[in-house]
Amino acid sequence: MDLNEKIINILSSVGLTKNLSIFILDLIPILIILLGATLGVLVIVWLERKISAAVQQRIGPEYAGPLGMIQALADGLKLVLKEDIIPAKGDPWLFSVGPALVVVPVFLSYLVVPFGHELILANLGVGILFWIALSSIAPLGLLMAGYGSNNKYSFLGGLRAAAQAISYEIPLALCVLSVALLSHSLSTVDIVEEQSKYGILGWNIWRQPIGFIAFLIASLAECERLPFDLPEAEEELVAGYQTEYCGIKFGLFYVGSYLNLLVSALFVSVLYLGGWNFSLPWINFPILLTENDFALSLNIVNATLGIAITLGKAYLFLFLSILARWTLPRVRMDQLLDLGWKFLLPVSLGNLLLTASLQLALL
């Protein structure tokens, strides 16, 4: 009897019908994504404020909870309670759909993020391409939001977001394809398993150093983080495509930005840093299939360690992105496009061709 059947039997024993039990079971992954990703955003916001304060020799959030840990929750509650205003001459449909089109694809990206061999919500054979496809939808929402606001700053911000996404989506996809060639699979689980054979020496960061650097730069640009935050440059565009937004719609953009940053960090961990595996080769807890208390306890420990290791590696990338915000100047729009088309695209394409040539030579 597998875990799903056990949960259905437990729900049926309390008086629920089998169909209702199956429906509730299908809702569990959705709740896991919503709660886990939201908690991750709260942690990232708190970390960014604390690290930013340390860089500037300040204290940062301190009074809202221990060490200011619930400051982000208070800010989110404030945005939810604010009035939702739609511009008088704007397009209400585009203005309202834009934020949802930004957040929903990012939430769906968490379906293919593995935290263990069996600890993944949807182990798709084309999982990595699924993420690339979803990440290309969000800029459409930004463009709709900018156009629907009937504001020149918002429209320019939306155009910048679309141009930036097109420029950096291609190098990002080419870097991902290079990793897929090495792993002989597009499944995120298979990519992590391929890196686990030789411990830390088997990580793709050593086999794909050029692709790793290109992936980091493209990821920062996709997340619109400094020095690539051209779509919402405060000195030039007030707040870019967010200028006319307030209340919960503005909060959706805010959450979507950090969700995208977190999922990018998780994919850095999965693609290049070995995912949930330990750094030492052949050291791992086995997944026991027997149904006794010891096996259950060991599987829980294994799953907990997998989640902790994956998040630890991901937060290393988050730390670097937060430091980059306060150490690097914002680039101009022409420099942004030149970096994407004239540098990252040739480098990532050359890296893909080199990887394919080496793989053919080893056949």
UniProtKB/Swiss-Prot annotation:
GO terms for molecular function: NADH dehydrogenase activity; oxidoreductase activity, acting on NAD(P)H, quinone or similar compound as acceptor; quinone binding. It is found in: Plastid, Chloroplast thylakoid membrane. Signal peptide: none annotated. The keyword Translocase applies. Its main location: plastid. Disulfide bonds: none annotated. It catalyses: a plastoquinone + NADH + (n+1) H(+)(in) = a plastoquinol + NAD(+) + n H(+)(out); a plastoquinone + NADPH + (n+1) H(+)(in) = a plastoquinol + NADP(+) + n H(+)(out). Keywords: Chloroplast, Membrane, NAD, NADP, Plastid, Plastoquinone, Quinone, Thylakoid, Translocase, Transmembrane, Transmembrane helix. PROSITE patterns: COMPLEX1_ND1_1, COMPLEX1_ND1_2. It comes from the Eukaryota. The chain crosses the membrane at residues 27-47, 93-113, 124-144, 162-182, 200-220, 250-270, 303-323, 343-363. GO terms for cellular component: chloroplast thylakoid membrane. Its EC number is 7.1.1.-. It is a multi-pass membrane protein. It is an enzyme of class 7 (translocase). It holds the Pfam family NADHdh. One of its GO terms (biological process) is aerobic respiration. The keyword Cell cycle does not apply. InterPro entries: NADH_UbQ_OxRdtase_su1/FPO (IPR001694), NADH_UbQ_OxRdtase_su1_CS (IPR018086). HAMAP family: NDH1_NuoH (MF_01350). NDH shuttles electrons from NAD(P)H:plastoquinone, via FMN and iron-sulfur (Fe-S) centers, to quinones in the photosynthetic chain and possibly in a chloroplast respiratory chain. The immediate electron acceptor for the enzyme in this species is believed to be plastoquinone. Couples the redox reaction to proton translocation, and thus conserves the redox energy in a proton gradient. Belongs to the complex I subunit 1 family. PANTHER family: NADH DEHYDROGENASE SUBUNIT 1, NADH-UBIQUINONE OXIDOREDUCTASE CHAIN 1. NDH is composed of at least 16 different subunits, 5 of which are encoded in the nucleus. This is NAD(P)H-quinone oxidoreductase subunit 1, chloroplastic. It comes from Chaetosphaeridium globosum. The gene is ndhA.
